[in-house]
Amino acid sequence: MNQKEINELRRRFRPEKSAISRVYGCYVNSSKEIVSDLDESLGMMPQEESEKYLSLLKKGLSGSLGKNLIDIVFSTQQVADSEEHRLLTTLWDSQLKDNEARQTFYHKVIDSLDMGDSSYLLLLTCDSYDVPHRGKDDSLQADASDEVFTYIVCVVCPIKEGKVELGYFPGDNEFHCAAEQTVAPPELGFLFPAFDDRAANIYNALFYSRKANEIHQEFIDAIFHVEAPMSAVEQKEAFQSALSDAFDCSLEVMQTVHEQLCEKIKEHRESRSSEPLEMSASEIGQILQSCGIADEQVAAFQENCGEQFGSGVVLNPANLIDSSRFEIKTPEITISADPEYSYLVETQIINGRKYLLIPAEDGVEVNGFAVGITVAQKDD
């Protein structure tokens, strides 16, 4: 799926556009026991409550592609005959009305998911989208629909315990201490089937993780039974390892790599392309060559990438660097700079000692106080 297709589905979760009639799910306590089973009509709820449910479900389609939203790909064999795909298909075909399939799914999630000591609300819903035709000018023509896309969305929301406060209990006509429980935004979730080329693709699902460094591999293995993809944090660490194992990285090389990857990210953002940004290891190798890195070291980097990520892999630069800052650390000091001005940081050896140099003209502040830079006078 691309960003445009995700955005198109996200708009379905607005109250004025939603055709979702029911939500299903269960409340699971910290002992992995189902406390309550949910089967509710949105139309019978107060509007404020139904909007809360839609908002939680919509969160399962938020974040960045390749970082929070990850493609799950089923093998042909899985689609043809596998327990995991058969269960998802049963839920989908029945539009979640098959109670036995729902209960089987709930217990699969409960048995596998590690949420620590947190209780959680598991939510499921189904929507049928009358897909409008998209014109040559990219506009949607609602009266020219020729396909209905039916899909299910699942989200897992932690239950947060509020602070203990004194409150009034009308039944007792007394004040007592109590802590309110609230449903937090989803920690993870998925959409099935994928909405590829604006049509159902049963060979794919879209997985959501709120934290890019915690993608709940145990859930992916149990529900989809596929090899969990590398998280964005793991990709960044693997990229750093591929670089450092190939050659000794200098500040100047890392400045150039960071600068050029930032430029690629900026160009992609400005292009408003719906497809995720991708670069091959050989394209990054060309950046290294422009820094003066020897051909054999560039080849070693590309080989390392193959070992770390797999043969012929394409990389998303947004997962390899933090494009919002350029940070340099020593054991005692951290320097954080706007990537646009990272070139101002230089290295120099003075009297045998290594230094990081930053030009300091006007506008220097220390803890919010404006200060001047003076030259210390040496005693004769």
Regions found by a protein language model. Name each.
Residues 17, 21-322:
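Long, hydrophobic alpha/beta structural blocks
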Residues 8-12:
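Post-signal/leader-peptide non-cytosolic segments of secretory proteins
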Residues 275, 287-380:
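C-terminal, beta-strand-rich globular interaction domains
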Residues 3-7:
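Soluble regions of membrane-associated proteins that transit the secretory/organelle pathway
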